[in-house]
Each structure stands twice: as C-alpha cells, then as structure tokens.
C-alpha cells in the first residue's frame, strides 16, 4: 500500500503464508485497546501470537505490518455465517482506540490508566450487550482512513463481500470495534444500502443522542410503539433514512427517533 496515509511499513513475520485462491473475501475491524506504540510492539512481538495487516493511528495514518495477500493472526477463535477460523478468509484492520472506559470523577479511564475528557467519550449500548457503557470515540480521520482503505481493498480483491467486526465473529469474547465505531454505516456505504439513489439529498451518516434520553419507536410518529428502552444521552446511532423530521436509526436495535434530539455528525 502507498499514499499519504501510510506512515511506514513494518516487517511482521507472524503470518500463515498466502491466502488460498479466492480469498480474502472479508474485512474484519478491530480496536487495539491500547495506544499506538504499545499496540505496535505487541503486534510485532514474536512471542505474542497475534498480528494484523494494518494499524491505524488516531491521526488516520497507517502502519502496514503484514502484506494483504498473506494470512495474519487477528481473528483468533472465530465463526460467522457457517464458517470458522476467519484468519484464513479475512484482512484485519486494527484501529488505535481504548475501547470501554470507566467513569472516575470528571474523567473516564481506560483499563491501562489513561484518562479521557467527556468529549472523547460516548455512552452507548454494544450490539451484544443490553446496558449502556462508556466507550472511547474514534476520530474522524480514523473513520475516513478505514473507509478509503476498505474501498481500495475491495478494488484489489473483488471477492470481498463482507465487512465485519471482531465482535461479530467472536461475540462471546470480543467487543471490538464497539458501538463508537459506525460499522453498520460503513457497510451500508460500501456494500450497498437501502438509502435513496445518488440523485437524492445526502443523508447524514451518524448522530448522537443529545437529550437525556430519547425514545425509539416502530414508526415515525410520536404515538409509535416503543421498540426498546430509551437511548441514553451520547448514544451513537447509524442513520438509515429520514421521514418528516424523524430518522430511522440503528444501534443494537432499529427504529425511529425524532431528529430534533440528535446531534448530527
């Protein structure tokens, strides 16, 4: 890979050789659960049985570790869609992000002790969980780099038809990339969506709940039936469609919310 977003190439020997013919056909998105340098050290450490194809820093820059035509060790024990062992099917993208955070006074802390301000945090419900937690936000630069990289990979490897989270191929043990990453929106953009045609007005991609709580309903009207518990303030949602000031959104559930109470990204 080449271009302005590539910081450097780092040699990583932790591969299982080249993909078989017809693969890769999947991209898997991860968070590092740690800062850039320690994550890079882990990924290249020969004593650690983990690697990835690329590592994306907070500024959107890319470090490539494993060639895209070779199998990296990022998915681990994994299964999805009737297949298991996703390393042999997929390209692994690691994004520098601390994952779940714990509130401590006026700041939020990662498992390794880093402190974050409220502006770096979103409260949201994970797709595999039922209660809201605090999560480290991704930067706009990271999200755009991931989008552009996925486009390039899909062009280079036309068999790629899936973009998955680690949380989807290993739901009982992994939570990355988590609800702070707009995974569903990315899939809609790159793999086809139910949005309007190109000639229609551009919908915003994501939003955050601005009210203390926000009802999510089965129809775009104030007397629509509630489909889940109200979304707490800060919840990030993927926007699917719009109708008369209401947005159809997706988190762990799908439903309609009144657009007035969303901060649009």
Predicted ranges, named:
Residues 251-265:
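Boundary regions of SH3-family modules and the immediately adjacent low-complexity/disordered segments
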């Amino acid at each position: 890979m080449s271009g302005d977003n590539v910081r450097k190439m780092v040699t990583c020997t932790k591969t299982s050789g080249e993909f078989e013919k017809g693969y890769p056909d999947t991209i898997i998105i991860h968070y590092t659960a740690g800062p850039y340098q320690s994550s890079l050290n882990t990924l290249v450490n020969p004593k650690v049985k983990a690697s990835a194809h690329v590592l994306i820093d907070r500024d959107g820059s890319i470090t490539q570790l494993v060639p895209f035509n070779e199998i990296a060790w990022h998915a681990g024990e994994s299964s999805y869609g009737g297949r298991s062992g996703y390393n042999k099917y997929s390209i692994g993208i690691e994004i520098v992000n601390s994952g779940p955070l714990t509130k401590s006074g006026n700041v939020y802390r990662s498992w390794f002790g880093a402190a974050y301000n409220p502006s770096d945090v979103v409260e949201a419900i994970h797709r595999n969980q039922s209660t809201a937690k605090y999560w480290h936000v991704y930067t706009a630069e990271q999200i755009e780099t991931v989008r552009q990289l996925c486009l390039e990979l899909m062009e280079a490897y036309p068999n790629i038809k899936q973009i998955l989270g680690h949380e989807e191929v290993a739901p009982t043990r992994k939570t990355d990339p988590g609800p702070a990453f707009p995974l569903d929106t990315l899939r809609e953009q790159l793999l086809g969506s139910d949005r309007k045609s190109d000639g229609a007005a551009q919908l915003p991609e994501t939003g955050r709940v601005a009210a203390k709580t926000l009802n999510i309903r089965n129809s775009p009207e104030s007397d629509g039936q509630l489909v889940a518990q109200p979304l707490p303030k800060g919840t990030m949602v993927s926007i699917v469609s719009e109708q008369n000031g209401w947005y159809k959104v997706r988190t762990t559930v799908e439903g309609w919310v009144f657009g007035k109470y969303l901060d649009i990204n």
